[in-house]
């Protein structure tokens, strides 16, 4: 088979995956609405373990598919956090920290600011994201990490933010990190 033909097949598979992903996001929206009604949390590690268990095996195909499913679930949670934020369902502690950072950026003469997030990831991913997941999600959304420090079990991540519009575009991501960390603090440095 010629490379062009193979690429056409790949494009067809990608198109089908896009349709399924869109369907998955719609389901995620329904899940978010149900969780809002029951005041449940977005991140449910036990549910994610159930999903992974559906795809056992050590063959390369199964391992790669579990990674794919893991990323899809991470993106679904990110989508759900956006729905929670859009409905005003935000933890007061996060909102206080976020508004403080927003005000500090507004007070500066420059639009370029560094935001430091100190957090404790969940090393066992029992109640939150691991450090690997956190770094992955920061990279996935184009967050410019300028400093990364470890101190015991805590991680300090400094990111560059170009004004309050850029900060607002990262709000959902920061909220996801807040909700899926053992501890969390955000400030301008």
Per-range role (PLM):
Residues 1-189:
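Domain-level signature for soluble enzymes in the chorismate/prephenate branch of the shikimate pathway
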